[in-house]
Each structure stands twice: as structure tokens, then as C-alpha cells.
Amino acid sequence: MKNGQPLVVLDPGHNYSVTDTGATGCGLREQDITYAIASRVKPLLERNGFTVVMTRNNLTDNVSTESVSASLHRRADIANDANADLFLSIHCNAGGGSGTETYYFEDSSIGKTLATVIQRNVVSEVGLQNRGVKSAGFAVLRYTGMVAALLETAFIDTEADAAQLGSISGQEAYARGIAKGICEYFGKSFQ
């Protein structure tokens, strides 16, 4: 908590540079979409009484250009150094599918609770297929010392999903779902 406000770290997945740029598909780049969504979540959370730190502060920001591993460790370090109350990493899925899924760190009951409320609210706002809540050992979930989740918004390489990801209205729907889920997790009403 910072000044009595929960501190949330939003992690727009991947980097702008050649190291760890993420998936591409349907004319979209994951690093652009994740930043666009996270930058829309931030003011919604701030309006609802949260302090928000972003791991990337602009579209062309790079968390680390050394390696994918260094980038993942640095993202967790940002959250740990900020003494965050919650960490959410935002991603786009790829590989031919459809829908939204949210991950939590293996055997973390509070992570599962967070992932469940994020998933439910995002699916409700966006209306894509509910692929469920799943456990995983992703580095950003493993190395963060607070409740954490990783959201795979939709499939960037599937036309219907990409249409949602690439549109302003779709990005705003993701942002509302994420912000509503975080508010619900902390027992706050979304305003």
C-alpha cells in the first residue's frame, strides 16, 4: 500500500526492440497491443483509488534488451522493488485458437483467486470464448513476491480475436474488464 492505496504493477508483456518482442499476426504486434491495453487500464485504476506502476512507460520502452530472461527478471524486480500489492502481466496468445485465458503461479490460492476474477470480468466485458483459469510456472509469476496473474487477452493470429485486440473499443473493453477484476479482488466497487 502506498498512502493507503493498493499499489498495482501492470506489465505490458514484451519489448519494443528486437529482444523479446512477442507474437505477431493479422498486422498486429504483441508489444504494441499489450502496451495499448495497459495504458488504458492505468487511469481506470487510478480513478478507483489505486497507485499504478507500469513496467514499460511508453510504446517504445524496453524493460531489458540483454535477453528474454533478463527482461522477465527485470519485470519481477520492478514489482518487488515497488513493494506492489498485485502484479498483472498482459499478453496476447498465438498459435491458432480463440478466446481469453488467465494464469496464476502453481499452487497459489490467492493467485488463483486473482486470475479467476480477472478472467470472469474480462470475458464479460469482451465477450470472447472463456478458455479458463490455469496454473503455470511462468517466470514473471514465479519471481514476483506478491499476488500475480498473467492474462492472455486473445489470439493475435486469429482474425476475430485480432479484430478485438486491434480496435480502440476492444482495447477499452479489455481495460475495463481488467480494472473491474482488480477492483473486485480488493473488494472495491468499480467507478
What is each PLM-predicted segment?
Residues 74, 120, 163:
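Charged/polar, solvent-exposed surface patches and flexible loops
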Residues 106, 122, 155-157:
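Non-catalytic surface loops within mature trypsin-like serine protease
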Residues 1-9, 14-114:
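Catalytic-core regions of hydrolytic enzymes
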Residues 39-50, 80-84, 92, 119-128, ...:
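Sec-exported extracytoplasmic/periplasmic mature domains
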Residues 30, 119, 152:
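Acidic-residue sensor for enzyme active/binding pockets
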Residues 49, 99, 129-130, 145-147:
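A generic structural signal for alpha->beta connector loops
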Residues 6, 77, 81-82, 87-89, ...:
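Active-site-adjacent mobile loop/cap segments within catalytic or ligand-binding domains
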Residues 109-134:
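Active-site-adjacent substrate-binding region
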